[in-house]
Amino acid sequence: MSSTRRKSPGSPIVLIIDDDADTRRMYGEYLRMKSCTVFVAGDGRSGLDKAVDLNPDLIVLDLAMPRVDGWTVLKHLRESSWTIDIPVIVLTAVVTVRDEAFHAGCDAYLTKPCPPEVLWLQTVALLRDREGLRERAGRGPRV
């Protein structure tokens, strides 16, 4: 398994898995502006592959995608020891499945259209929570 690590402690790696190119571009540009290192995947299959390869700090995941949908991606992320602790923000146009998404293992649920600022605030909160948990577990910050 190869794994890409952060370029610097202040540059979290975010993987956006969404079949809509405009969505990937808009949120990707905003997160890059906020000093994130952003990778994208246009479907669930390539998203799963990148999640294992990159070991990102956070994943932004759409639910309705071709090849492998977001539900299947989330299930695999939560079942794999490589990806189980990566925070996942579900960002979807589907407004009626919030409870199911949390039950499936997402850490946050946002509906499209979502202002990029809201995604950023949720990203910061989840990354802060994750680092706090790692430090309390004696594993220290991830580098």
Regions found by a protein language model. Name each.
Residues C114-A125:
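C-terminal output helix
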Residues M65:
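Receiver (REC) domain active-site loop signature in two-component systems and cognate sites
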Residues I89-L91:
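Hydrophobic/aromatic residues positioned on beta-strands within the core alpha/beta folds
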Residues S35-G42, K50:
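Short hydrophobic/Thr-rich beta-strand motif most characteristic of the beta2 strand and flanking loop
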Residues L54-V60:
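Active-site beta3 strand of CheY-like receiver
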Residues R25-M33:
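Charged docking surfaces used in two-component/phosphorelay signaling
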